[in-house]
């Protein structure tokens, strides 16, 4: 019987560098783009595979039938074309520089249930070590929680960016969870100065994540 791949095996394949190290830049670019374009233009880039809704001010159900996943987006969010094939959902809200993303990494085989917690924790610990080397990143925290019915490893941090004369501090929450042979990364990004106004609804959104 083939053995499952260890968290350190994941590191050897550089999955962290491929699927995580660039996600902060994707978040920043999406947030900046939607601020510049405005909600109307962002809504115009909604993927055709996702059902249209009557108004961006209403909550809407997003789903990906290919992966068999869904969640309810908060009011005010507009869907935009994911910038990379690994990202299946990219939703933005211009006020507060908010972004919600879901990306997926296929595994060779499912991780046994009894080993999933250790697998997730060690995966985030490896990424945490990378983040700690960046002086622009602060307030790094990791832990375990649940997203819907799924056990998940959590990682939060704040990163500073300099855009000309403008300083932007982006707050990020990432959740790593397993479902079948897929590893999902759920990401929330918000302007650090106003994040408390939005985090509650964004976290509630992630709790609606489900598989079918």
Regions found by a protein language model. Give the residues of each.
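N-terminal amphipathic/basic-hydrophobic helices that include classical n-h-c signal peptides
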Residues: 1-16
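Bacterial N-terminal signal peptides that target proteins for export
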Residues: 12-26
């Amino acid at each position: 019987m083939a053995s499952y791949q260890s968290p350190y095996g994941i590191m050897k394949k550089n999955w962290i560098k491929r699927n995580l190290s660039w996600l902060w830049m994707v978040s920043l670019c999406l947030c900046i783009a939607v601020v510049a374009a405005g909600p109307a233009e962002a809504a115009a880039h909604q993927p055709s595979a996702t059902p249209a809704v009557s108004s961006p001010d209403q909550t809407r159900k997003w789903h990906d039938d290919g992966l068999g996943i869904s969640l309810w987006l908060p009011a005010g969010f507009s869907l935009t074309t994911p910038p990379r094939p690994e990202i299946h959902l990219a939703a933005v809200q211009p006020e507060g520089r908010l972004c919600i993303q879901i990306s997926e990494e296929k595994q060779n085989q499912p991780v046994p249930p009894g080993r999933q917690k250790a697998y997730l924790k060690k995966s985030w610990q490896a990424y945490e070590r990378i983040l700690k080397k960046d002086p622009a990143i602060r307030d790094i925290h990791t832990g375990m929680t649940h997203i819907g019915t799924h056990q998940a490893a959590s990682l939060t941090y704040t990163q500073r960016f300099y855009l000309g004369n403008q300083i932007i501090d982006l707050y990020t929450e990432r959740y790593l969870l397993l479902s079948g042979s897929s590893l999902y990364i759920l990401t929330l990004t918000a302007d650090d100065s106003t994040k408390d106004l939005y985090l509650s609804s964004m976290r509630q959104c992630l709790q609606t994540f489900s598989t079918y």
